[in-house]
């Protein structure tokens, strides 16, 4: 750590030690290296997410779809005005409650069930049993976190692989409901 004044250096060093906020030189190298491809990675994240939204929107197995890139999203206009893209996070409410969610998750191969979101790999989380499991069902419902809610962090894998994975998982939910399959777009 470098500071112009010794007192500032001492104070910053104390906070860095207390909070563990300093990275190693190798961490700094990796950060700088990763910044070079950040724009390209974010572009692929968003393109993949838009492709999945197209597949999910209006599907019989989907009760609701939440992504600010959809014109129907309540935050769409402000997101369009303030952002250069709509991101790679989306939430879906699956039909069929817990059984529908289990069928969907069991059908995924490209997405990993995880609470960590935002990496280059595609991840999915079930908030009712993961991040918000300690909340009562009533508190979750009041917060809009139903048993059918899934949160996705879409990665940079090939879009066709992700679409096929989601389509197969949706087919499992539709089969559970006893409805005919909807063809993928």
Please report, for each region that a protein language model flagged, where it lies by residue:
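Active-site C-terminal subdomain of aminotransferase-like
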Residues: 1-89, 93-123
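PLP-dependent enzyme catalytic core of the Aspartate aminotransferase-like
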Residues: 41, 106, 122-185
């Amino acid at each position: 750590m470098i500071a112009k004044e010794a007192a500032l250096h001492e104070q910053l060093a104390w906070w860095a030690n207390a909070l563990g906020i300093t990275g190693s030189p190798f961490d700094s190298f990796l950060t700088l290296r990763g910044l070079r491809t950040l724009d390209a990675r974010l572009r692929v994240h968003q393109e993949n997410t838009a492709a999945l939204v197209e597949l999910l929107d209006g599907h019989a197995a989907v009760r609701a779809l939440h992504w600010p890139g959809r014109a129907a999203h309540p935050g769409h206009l402000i997101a369009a005005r303030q952002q250069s893209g709509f991101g790679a996070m989306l939430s879906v409410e699956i039909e069929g409650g817990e059984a529908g969610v289990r069928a969907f998750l069991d059908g995924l191969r490209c997405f990993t069930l995880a609470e960590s979101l935002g990496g280059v790999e595609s991840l999915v989380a079930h908030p009712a049993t993961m991040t918000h499991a300690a909340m009562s069902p009533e508190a979750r419902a009041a917060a809009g976190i139903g048993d059918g809610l899934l949160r996705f962090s879409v990665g940079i894998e090939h879009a066709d692989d992700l679409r096929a994975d989601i389509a197969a998982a949706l087919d499992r939910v539709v089969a559970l409901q006893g409805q005919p399959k909807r063809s993928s777009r």
